Regions:
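Structured interface patches
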Residues: 1-171
Length: 171
């Protein structure tokens, strides 16, 4: 069972230069709003693998890995969708290393694990949440699910610009 945490004190590991540790921690991820619709993360409290390595100069190399499903309606057909999303994020935090080597998730030796996990998950979200890659969506005329009836079709509506010609009777 993973320890529950939203932040983690890196100094309490007492790592010497070049030493590393792998930890499994539980982090809560709040639901996401995506294109105006709320999507839940399943499970809401996920086990993450955190690799921490102490760099030779005062700093840390961090790696965060986990997988979780994004649960909500398919953006094409509105059926349930739950694509699994794998996250593999890396950060470096080195004192005096400038902006490039300073992680926004490490403040005073404290790693904001919940915010890093949320941001890393958000960066790996797909452009569209779909139930399956070949989802056909809904019929634009009647709203029928085209996955259930792939041969679904409607008679083409006549062009209204030619309506008066239909009234013309040639005998």
């Amino acid at each position: 069972m993973a320890a529950r945490t939203d932040s983690f004190d890196l100094a309490k590991l007492n790592l010497s230069s070049g030493e590393g540790r792998r930890l499994t921690l539980a982090v809560a991820l709040d639901p996401f709003e995506f294109a105006g619709t709320e999507y839940a993360v399943d499970p809401a409290r996920i086990d993450v693998t955190l690799d921490i390595s102490r760099m030779t100069h005062d700093g840390y190399a961090l790696r965060l890995r986990f997988a979780a499903a994004l649960v909500g309606p398919c953006m094409r057909c509105l059926e349930d969708a739950a694509p699994s999303i794998d996250v593999d994020a890396r950060e470096v935090d080195q004192a005096g290393g400038g902006e490039e080597l300073s992680s926004p998730y490490v403040q005073g030796g404290e790693l904001d694990l919940a915010q890093w996990a949320r941001d890393a998950y958000a960066l790996t979200l797909p452009n569209q949440v779909v139930c399956r890659a070949d989802c056909a969506g809904l019929c634009p005329v009647c709203g029928a699910n085209l996955n259930d009836d792939p041969g679904h079709a409607h008679e083409r509506a006549p062009d209204p610009r030619w309506a008066k010609l239909r009234e013309l009777r040639l005998e």
